[in-house]
A protein has these predicted regions:
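Membrane-helix and juxtamembrane interface regions of eukaryotic multi-pass membrane proteins
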Residues: 1-122, 127-130, 134-214
Length: 214
């Protein structure tokens, strides 16, 4: 029955193309596929956060199994879409997805579960503003979101750089599998790299305003 989870994501994507949903999301023919993918990704992130928080509250094996299948199926599904569409700009996400699958495998096998799941939960929480800002920019590219982008950068860097930095020593000492250990350090440095990218974007947004005013 586990295979049923894998058809969940195509169903979610299909629902996003229904006229009433597209009207609500203010989707146009030019941005429909990207907005649809963003919504599917947001559904995964929110669902994953809820399931993982429930696990920490209950320590239920059923919940952690569902959480594993929920996230594992999403990364396989999205990786498949990236592969068949051959969109080079999305290839880095393939590496990210493979890294996530490595971590999820250890979580599912109860290897350093609490540490890995906690860091995985933080990573999903750090992504939440990204979906909102991406959606707004897709439906209104000219909207000034420099302050929202600043808050996004602060939010993301707090979880993915500051909080993650507090667990570098724990990851180095306590994670059993070397591949998982390397994967976690990759995720940490990827977060730092994305933070730098966000900082550059925020700096450019505020600089552009300053130039126009002068």
């Amino acid at each position: 029955m586990n295979w049923l989870v894998y058809i969940f994501w195509p169903i979610v994507k299909f629902i996003t193309f229904k006229p009433e949903i597209q009207k609500t999301l203010k989707v146009t023919t030019q941005n429909s596929d990207k907005i649809s993918n963003n919504v599917v990704s947001a559904v995964h992130s929110i669902g994953s956060i809820i399931l993982n928080m429930l696990y920490f509250l209950t320590k239920s094996n059923n919940i952690i199994s569902l959480s594993f299948l929920y996230s594992y199926s999403y990364f396989v599904y999205d990786g498949y879409l990236i592969a068949i569409k051959k969109n080079v700009e999305n290839y880095p996400y393939m590496i990210h997805h493979i890294a996530a699958l490595v971590v999820l495998e250890d979580i599912n096998k109860n290897i350093n579960r609490d540490l890995l799941l906690y860091l995985y939960l933080l990573a999903e929480i750090s992504n939440l503003p990204n979906y909102v800002i991406y959606h707004i920019l897709k439906i209104n590219p000219n909207r000034d979101l420099k302050h929202a982008k600043l808050l996004q950068m602060i939010w993301f860097s707090f979880f993915r750089v500051f909080i993650y930095s507090l667990y570098v020593k724990d990851c180095f000492k306590n994670i059993d599998h070397n591949l998982t250990k390397l994967t976690m350090f990759f995720i940490y440095f990827a977060g730092a790299y994305w933070t730098i990218g966000q900082f550059k974007g925020v700096y450019t947004s505020f600089s552009r305003k300053t130039i126009k005013s002068s």
